[in-house]
UniProtKB/Swiss-Prot annotation:
Chain segments carrying region Fe-S binding site B: 279-293
Motif extent (Cx2C motif 1): 279-282
Gene that produces this protein: DRE2
Comment text on domains: The C-terminal domain binds 2 Fe-S clusters but is otherwise mostly in an intrinsically disordered conformation.
Protein name, entry field: Fe-S cluster assembly protein DRE2
């Protein structure tokens, strides 16, 4: 059997007092097939059995989840592997460290033995897993880490509302709640809306045109080759219709004439020799005169009547 590897002595983290004797919790030794063949695994177990109970596990069973560790069941965990085992454990190292952190008691220690320079990132991996690195001895190939002492978390139950608490609540009067949002109080005097109306407001307006009767039949218009007499009826109505002539002067008035009178005035204006203009309707008043008409501003005159423009009428 090969000589035993140096093992760091540990102090029991959580001794259980049985009378006056302090009993240590078991230790866990983790090895591999390589360390079992060269005797390192067995030598480590023999050294630890002199002071406490020792449990044994192989690395592949923990990595493959073939077995799990009971929470807070070991005071210390000792790992002895070959350099090739440490190199092949790089991808599954966080998973293994998480299991070991669960299996250790608070302030329990983790001992990594027979390390090489190929695992220089192991201290940082231990810190990320939740361990406190106590000592790192690269020359001796040993790292000791400790599980921190966490304060046990306690759950605080939330108080549920008692059934009687709803009955003790003060009930709100619906009338008071409605009065809070009312725009006026009951003591406010009311205003008669009819008193706000004047006599003019109450006067019924006279419609400017006849009301439209949707049920009344629509009147047809005469066609071009009318032979039913509708064209003659429309022509008679046109002649009997009235036309309003507006005087565009400042004091001008409106005069209502018939269609025949309008046609007579137009014919007379065309026949008048002195009433010369481009439109031929200057005698009708400013409403029928263009912007450059010389008679603009003068009252209407009869066709053929001589109109004299006094220059004294202009304001110089």
């Amino acid at each position: 059997m090969s000589p035993s590897m140096p093992v760091a002595t540990t102090v029991a983290a959580d001794p259980i007092a049985v009378g006056a004797v302090a009993v240590k919790r078991p230790a866990l030794v983790i090895g591999s097939l390589s360390t079992a063949e060269d005797g390192t695994y067995q030598a480590l177990i023999s050294d630890l059995q002199s002071s406490r109970q020792v449990d044994r596990q192989l690395l592949d069973r923990l990595v493959d989840n073939a077995t799990t560790l009971e929470p807070s069941s070991y005071d210390s965990v000792h790992i002895t592997l070959a350099p090739s085992d440490y190199q092949g454990l790089t991808q599954k190292l966080p998973q293994l460290l998480s299991q070991l952190l669960t299996g250790l008691t608070p302030l329990g220690t983790l001992h990594l033995i027979n390390l090489t320079s190929a695992v220089r990132t192991l201290p940082s991996e231990l810190t990320l897993a939740g361990f406190n690195v106590l000592s790192a001895l690269p020359d001796e190939g040993t790292i000791i880490a400790q599980k921190p002492q966490h304060v046990a978390s306690t759950s605080v139950p939330l108080k549920s509302r008692q059934p009687g608490a709803l009955l003790n609540r003060k009930k709100t009067d619906p009338a008071k709640k409605q009065a809070l949002w009312a725009l006026s109080s009951p003591s406010t005097p009311k205003i008669d809306p009819e008193a706000l109306l004047t006599a003019e407001d109450k006067t019924r307006l006279t419609p400017a045109c006849e009301p439209v009767r949707s049920s009344a039949p629509r009147r047809k218009k005469a066609c071009k080759s009318c032979s039913c007499g509708l064209a003659e009826l429309e022509e008679e109505e046109r002649k009997l219709g009235k036309v309003v002539l507006l005087d565009g002067s400042q004091d001008g008035t409106a005069k209502e004439v018939s269609q025949d009178e309008k046609e007579r005035l137009i014919i007379a204006a065309k026949a008048a020799p002195k009433a010369t203009s481009s439109c031929g309707s200057c005698f009708l008043g400013d409403a029928f005169r263009c912007a450059g008409c010389p008679y603009l501003g003068l009252p209407a005159f009869k066709p053929g009547e001589k109109v004299e423009i006094d220059f004294g009428m202009d304001d110089f």
